[in-house]
Design a protein with these regions (language model features):
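Helix-biased "structured C-terminal domain" signature
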Residues: 1-541
């Protein structure tokens, strides 16, 4: 069966992608399919090696479409290394064609330097990547500027801090994937503008929505359940091929908005509807946010990040205003096939006076690409490179993993300003068997110095329940409470084994934190190494 906008039968695509994963030795398993509405299907595809960390989601108007979507996203993120972008990759190159530049090297062309260092605040250290062992090199990947096919090197740290997965795509053909990637870029650009500016969007005429039976049927079914559903023109005045569907749950006063994009309106609307229901049942359409008039909260970068992760963030009441920000202006597309769709999208990009850079991947024998449109397709604000750089965690990675090699006072001086609630494995890019927070780490350092009162202040406010036990024993010592008076009570409440471990920690015989790496992390590195074999064979030619 050929789906609208796809260049191969869906069954053929699925079989091909299965073979790709089997060939590289990175097979994955599906979760149970969700099918809440007649034309909405979604699945989760997780790696067998590290299922909580390496996974993709798929959606579609039929079951096979959602399966193909999940496989496509999985291969896209596998082949582009996006699955590994948040992890330390010790003694490994990110890609064979990367270049590790000295500070001040020939990375970024003048136009890109003007964009990413407009205020002159960006330093070379801000461009050091998160993944490698380099501390004094800038690892960059070659991209091709679409307008003139000139190569430029873009630091990985810009890609991971600002763009993450935006603009990644996989397809049966190059242009099919490029249409997907550029459509996604336009969708997220319009979405962020609509949310931050509080734009009120015009509705699509009901007669037009009726002409797309799958979408109309699912809209009507949601309305019958009591939800207030609107199908909205998100083109920002006919500029971008973007649509939205809003859902108000009047029972708990929440609002959720999904977005979709594609040159073909029907495809855009189907994507928007399946996005609305992705990973959801009809029983959990009550976990959304209540709208607000506080637009500073809505436009906050943390809220925008929430919208990027799972579309569930705050929406401002201005979005619901009866006074619309734009006239209804559907875009006009009459072409046929991926080549025409891509040309249509490139014309839109040209109308916005934007340059696009493309990196292509085919070493798994299935096409993937990464597209970036500087000062347009970034998901995170440009000043994150200076004030919220992901590579900050790299600076303390070895301190955390091997703190015995360092002076404890130096460690505390280094981490003192860091938030106690920081998730340590996310911050430094590993997976621990037992994860801990920055506060737990600080407390451990203080315990090594026998600064028990300072450790107590952290432990009592920690989410670490075992830390609470250690805190109680510190209080007993401070208050000179007789052990014999409470030994039986402590054993009854906590158990003898935990009490003995807590005593050992206070005596310096054991550590509060466990730095043992989870097997999932080792499995993930093995996955990376399997890909490396394919990369080397491809790039050598």
């Amino acid at each position: 069966m050929n789906l609208l906008s796809k260049n191969s039968p869906v069954e053929q695509s699925i079989n091909k992608m299965k073979e790709v994963l089997k060939d590289v030795g990175c097979e994955a398993s599906f979760s149970q399919e969700k099918h809440p509405l007649e034309n909405c299907f979604s699945v989760n595809l997780a790696s067998n090696e590290a299922p909580n960390h390496i996974y993709s989601n798929g959606k579609g108007v039929i079951s096979d479409a959602s399966i193909a979507s999940a496989y496509g996203e999985y291969i896209e993120r596998l082949q582009t290394n996006n699955f590994f972008i948040d992890f330390h990759l010790p003694n490994r190159k990110y890609f064979p064609d990367e270049v590790a530049f000295d500070f001040g090297g020939d990375y970024l062309n003048p136009e890109l330097k003007e964009i990413y260092d407009a205020d002159g605040e960006l330093e070379d250290k801000d461009l050091v990547d998160f993944n490698s062992d380099y501390m004094d090199k800038i690892v960059a990947l070659p991209f091709i500027r679409e307008s003139d096919k000139v190569k430029t090197y873009i630091p990985i740290n810009i890609l991971s801090n600002l763009f993450v997965s935006n603009g990644l795509a996989t397809g049966n053909t190059a242009n099919e994937a490029k249409v997907q990637a550029l459509s996604e870029i336009f969708e997220r650009y319009a979405k962020i503008a609509i949310i931050k500016e509080g734009y009120a969007l015009p509705k699509f005429p009901d007669e037009l929505v009726k002409s797309f039976p799958k979408v109309y049927k699912d809209v009507q079914d949601l309305r019958k359940l009591g939800y207030i559903i609107e199908v909205l023109d998100s083109s920002l005045g006919g500029v971008f091929p973007v649509t939205a569907i809003s859902l108000i749950n009047p029972i708990n006063n929440t609002l959720f908005v999904s977005f979709g994009a594609h040159p073909i309106l029907e495809v855009s609307l189907e994507r928007t509807m399946t996005e609305l229901m992705q990973g959801r049942d009809l029983t959990n359409l009550d976990a959304f946010e209540i709208p607000t008039f506080d637009m500073s909260l809505v436009s906050d970068s943390f809220n925008i990040e929430a919208h990027f992760i799972d579309s569930n963030g705050k929406i401002g009441f201005p979005f619901l205003s009866a006074k619309k920000s734009f006239e209804y202006a559907p875009w006009k597309y009459t072409g046929n096939g991926s080549d025409a769709e891509y040309a249509f999208l490139l014309d839109i990009l040209a109308s916005q006076n934007r340059e696009m850079y493309v990196r292509e991947y085919t070493y798994l024998d299935f096409y993937s690409c990464q597209m970036i449109v500087p000062n347009f397709s970034e998901v995170y604000p440009l000043d994150d490179m200076v004030y919220n750089n992901k590579n900050n965690g790299k600076l303390i990675r070895d301190m955390v993993l091997n703190f015995e090699k360092y002076d404890v006072n130096d460690i505390l001086d280094t981490v003192d300003s860091l938030d106690d609630s920081l998730n340590m494995q996310l911050y430094i890019g590993v997976i621990f068997k037992e994860n801990f927070t920055m506060g737990d780490f600080k407390a451990q350092m203080l315990l090594l110095l026998q600064e028990y009162d300072d450790a107590l202040e952290i432990l009592e406010f920690s989410s670490n329940k075992f830390g609470h036990l250690v805190a109680q024993l510190i209080r007993m010592n401070n208050d000179e409470i007789e052990w014999a008076d409470y030994e039986e009570a402590l054993y009854n409440v906590y158990g003898k084994e935990k009490i003995q471990r807590a005593v050992n920690i206070l005596e310096g015989k054991e550590f509060l934190i466990n730095r043992t790496l989870h097997q999932d992390y080792n499995n993930m590195l093995s996955m990376f190494d399997k890909l490396e074999v394919k990369k080397l064979a491809f790039y050598k030619n």
